[in-house]
């Protein structure tokens, strides 16, 4: 039997590969070149938390998990830093970033760490409104799901620390979306529905996702009035999805992970780009601004954007730390750090270690690694290990 190839189909596949490669180059170039946060002429505005309805299960629901701790919590609005921009940016660079860890704002005791985490969320939000720079949201995402949510869902009794963390989660619901004119920013990924109402916009935005465990995000735009409407949609591309980890002076990516004996290599988050679809068709445009994928178009009510972020394991190395150190290398998947379920102070993780992928009874991805004595060590998300 002979097989006749469709030339146009072959060319189409090549064009898609070329477009994806072009997008990868743009994203990586942005990672290298974006060093200074440029201030906007007019700051953005967050969509108020009261306009955002969150739904879902477990730690996907920022507000819901926080209200389990204290049902009376109310979101505090995060505002632009205004005239204090230069001072706030200096404090961010000289005080906040140098102390930032893989999951939180600092390595201090629990009380101070929760306070610093909450302050970081407020700082990041105010500076983001002045710059529209995704790096502020990258670190916010890491702190929210790396340390704050962990404290909120931990089995420990209600305490000052748990209350502080819960308040920060509630405040962050007012940072999920931002607007300016006909521009809409999607900053954080969580199941939500919001009514975006301004002089230029009057739309319903639905977001459906399995983040932070799954990499698929669906965004639906519905107009209140009849006919079509124009929106310039900005969807954040997380730093971890393109090989960027802040602060870069302290941490670097490594894509040497081997899962079930197969090197992730070219399919790692560093070399595999996020994929965007509009109404089921892949978008091959390559407009990226300040770490956001931009879709500028006139929409029909009910149009959908779907994003697939690479959710493969990767390693983060601490700059300047001896490779023989137990804490020199850390395992991540998406925004979540993975740690041993059983505490083992002598276990040393290295980038060339073999990973076996498995999952828990409730479907959470896990990784098994053999130690020097051939004992199996199971790694689970830090957020769920106490």
Predicted stretch roles:
Residues 19-25:
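Sec-dependent signal peptide recognition
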Residues 225-233:
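Extended extracellular/luminal ectodomain segments enriched in beta-structured repeat modules
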Residues 1-18:
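N-terminal secretory signal peptides that target proteins for export/translocation
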Residues 27-35:
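Hydrophobic h-region of N-terminal signal peptides that target proteins for export
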């Amino acid at each position: 039997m002979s097989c006749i190839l469709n030339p146009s189909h072959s060319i189409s596949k090549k064009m898609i590969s070329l477009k994806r490669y072009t997008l990868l180059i743009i994203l990586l170039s942005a990672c290298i070149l974006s060093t200074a946060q440029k201030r906007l002429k007019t700051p953005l505005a967050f969509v108020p938390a009261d306009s955002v309805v969150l739904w879902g299960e477990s730690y996907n629901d920022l507000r819901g998990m926080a209200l389990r701790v204290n049902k009376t919590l109310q979101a505090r609005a995060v505002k632009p830093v205004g005239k204090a921009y230069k001072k706030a940016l200096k404090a961010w660079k000289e005080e906040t970033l140098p102390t930032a860890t893989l999951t939180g704002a600092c390595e201090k005791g629990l009380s101070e760490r929760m306070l610093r985490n909450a302050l970081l969320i407020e700082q990041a939000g105010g500076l983001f409104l002045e710059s529209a720079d995704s790096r502020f949201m990258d670190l916010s995402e890491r702190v929210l799901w790396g340390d704050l949510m962990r404290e909120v869902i931990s089995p420990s009794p209600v305490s000052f620390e748990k209350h502080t963390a819960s308040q920060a989660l509630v405040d962050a619901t007012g940072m999920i979306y931002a607007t300016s004119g006909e521009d809409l920013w999607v900053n954080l990924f969580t199941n939500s529905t919001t009514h975006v109402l301004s002089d230029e916009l009057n739309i319903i935005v639905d977001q459906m996702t399995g983040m932070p465990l799954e990499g698929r995000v669906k965004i639906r735009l519905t107009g209140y009035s009849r006919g079509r409407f124009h929106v310039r949609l900005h969807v954040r591309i997380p730093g971890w999805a393109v090989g960027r980890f802040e602060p870069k002076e302290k941490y670097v990516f490594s894509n040497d992970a081997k899962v079930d004996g197969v090197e992730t290599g070219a399919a790692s988050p560093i070399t595999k780009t996020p994929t965007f679809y509009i109404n089921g068709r892949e978008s091959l445009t390559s407009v990226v601004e300040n770490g956001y994928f931009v879709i500028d178009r006139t929409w029909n009510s009910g149009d959908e954007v779907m994003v697939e972020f690479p959710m493969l394991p990767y390693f983060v190395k601490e700059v300047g730390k001896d490779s023989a150190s137990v804490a020199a290398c850390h395992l991540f998947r998406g925004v979540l750090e993975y740690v041993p379920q059983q505490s083992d102070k002598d276990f040393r993780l290295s980038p060339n270690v073999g990973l076996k992928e498995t999952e828990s009874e409730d479907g959470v991805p896990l990784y098994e690694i053999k130690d020097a004595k051939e004992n199996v060590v199971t790694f689970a998300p830090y957020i769920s290990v106490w």
